[in-house]
Each structure stands twice: as C-alpha cells, then as structure tokens.
Amino acid sequence: MFGWHWLLEWQTPYEFHGHLIEKVFAEEKTPYQHVTLVEFTRFGKGLIIDGKVQSTLYDEHIYHELLVHPLLLSLPKPPKNVLILGGGEGATLREVLKYKSVEKAVMVDIDEKVIEFAKKYLYEWHQGAFEDKRTSLIITDGLKFINETKDKYDAIILDLTDPIKDSTSYMLYTKEFYEKLRGILNQGGGIVTQATSPSFSLEVYVTIYNTIKEVFKEASASYTYMASFDGLWGFVYGGVRPDLLSEDEVNSRIRERISGQLRFYDDYSHKISFSLPKNIKSEFKKITKVSTEKDPIYVPA
C-alpha cells in the first residue's frame, strides 16, 4: 500500500493535528482496535491506534524513557520483577531490560496483532526485547490478568491507550483498578502510568494524579513536550516520589542500575520534567475529582 494521505488526529472535539503520511506498512481492524503502521513525512515510522498517534521514530525515546526511568530509579532497591501493561511496540520493555537487576519483565497486552506488527515493522522500538530470556509476553486483557495473577512485582508500568469512552483501557485509570495494583506490589514498590496531555486534557491529567494519590498516598507528576503529539504529555507515579530525587542521586543511580545508553533522560531532564509550571500546579488545587468505576474519567476527544 503506497501513496500518501492525511491523518487528522482529533485532540479535542474542536481541534486536530494533521499528519502527512507517505506510506502505509500495515493496517488491520482487530477485535479490539484499529491498528495502522505508517511512515509520516515529518516523524518517520509511526504507530496509530483508533486514529491516535501512539509513538513515532522521531521522539518515542522521550516518552518511553520518561515513563520508565523515574519510577525504576526511585525504588529503594533495584527492581527484579517488573510488570508492564500495554506497551505493544516493545519500547517500554526495551527500557526496563536496561536494568542490570531485572530478572523478569512480564508484558501484558490485549492485542496480539499489535505485537505481531511491532515484531515485523518496529525493530527500532523493541530492539530485540521480545526475544530477551527475561521477557514473559502474555496476550490477555490487563484487568483480567491483574484479577488472576498470584505474583507480586517491584514495579508496575502502565503504557496504555488513553481513557477514551468505550475503549479497551478506560477502566484501567480508576481508583478500584489502582487498588488492585497496590495489592500485587512488593513492599517499597511503585507504579507509573501515562497520564494523557496537560495541553489538551488537563482535567484528566490532574484527575489521574488525584486518583493515584488517593490509593497510594505518595504520588508525583511529570510532563514533557512531545512534538509528534503536538503538545505536552504527562506521567503520574504512585508509591514512590521520583520528584524528590536530587540530580546527584539520579546520576549515581543511572550509573549503578542501568546498562545501556539513554538518549533523553538524565539528571537535568529529570529535574525539568518534574518542575511543573505555575499554571498547571494551580489546577492541582482546583480539581478534586477522583476517577472511579461508577464515574470514570475520559479524554475529551
């Protein structure tokens, strides 16, 4: 399938980000979602799910490094067992496996087709992580897995699609779900979730923070600019406080715990990412909503 067309990615009901597509590598409507792998004119190779850009070759490393490393470096002990929900491209798994201490990384994704596409087309993302002997890949619903697992983990990473109404993942942003995660964490463990965009869904970003803080008591929020997402992108951490790590602590723990190169994350980017601007911090005082199964939060688009 060659040629070109435009992807109009709706970020709110009244604005979109237009992406020129040079080539479509693969496209399929699975039982769970519409998956497309393309070559963007500006951002290179990219994954689209249900009309939303999930990651691109241009800046996926920024997203995945900030998702993974503040959590794993802030754990009191180097992690041994890590659980990933989502993250079908394999890049979150790639970053987790950089930790010398990791003995087992369990990755759970609902859609086998995304994994199949990633293995075939997205080597730059996973870089062989699916074949690592420490990797355990499970194809099932994340909520079902959490309800049934008997194992406990040092860290849980939620690399999920946005909480869109009637999607496969919106119930994975609720208080009840986070309580289940707390129950399968080892002592001293923590979680992180992608938390949508402070640019386009600030109320959702803050509500995810409120919900995690309600369950874990300890919580912190970070953000970064993602050009391929056309705005700021947020992350929320629970059970640990990566925002309290000093620059020296970040540097020393990178040296001690990580084997492999980081392209974005370091002591300086850590500090900047947790330095929320005044206008965003003020919303944390105004918005008090907590997402529950009876009243879940959704992104506006």
UniProtKB/Swiss-Prot annotation:
Keywords of this entry: Cytoplasm, Polyamine biosynthesis, Spermidine biosynthesis, Transferase
A Gene Ontology term for the protein's cellular component: cytoplasm
Native species: Saccharolobus islandicus (strain Y.N.15.51 / Yellowstone #2) (Sulfolobus islandicus)
Purpose of the protein: Catalyzes the irreversible transfer of a propylamine group from the amino donor S-adenosylmethioninamine (decarboxy-AdoMet) to putrescine (1,4-diaminobutane) to yield spermidine.
Pathway assigned to this chain's UniProt record: Amine and polyamine biosynthesis; spermidine biosynthesis; spermidine from putrescine: step 1/1
UniProt xrefs under PROSITE patterns: PABS_1 (PS01330), PABS_2 (PS51006)
Compartment list: Cytoplasm
Family from the record: Belongs to the spermidine/spermine synthase family.
Active site: D159
Enzymatic reactions: S-adenosyl 3-(methylsulfanyl)propylamine + putrescine = S-methyl-5'-thioadenosine + spermidine + H(+)
Subunit composition and interactions: Homodimer or homotetramer.
GO terms, biological process: spermidine biosynthetic process
Record has Cytoplasm as a keyword: yes
Record domain PABS: where: 4-240
Recorded superkingdom: Archaea
Stored PANTHER family: THERMOSPERMINE SYNTHASE ACAULIS5
GO molecular function annotation: spermidine synthase activity; thermospermine synthase activity
Pfam families in alphabetical order: Spermine_synt_N (PF17284), Spermine_synth (PF01564)
Binding residue positions for S-methyl-5'-thioadenosine: Q33, D109, D141, G142
EC number, UniProt record: 2.5.1.16
Binding positions (spermidine): H64, E89
Gene name of this polypeptide: speE
Principal location: cytoplasm
Keyword Cytoplasm (UniProt): yes
InterPro entries reported in the protein's UniProt record: PABS, PABS_CS, SAM-dependent_MTases_sf, Spermi_synthase, Spermidine_synt_N, Spermidine_synt_N_sf
Top EC category: transferase
Name of the protein this chain belongs to: Polyamine aminopropyltransferase
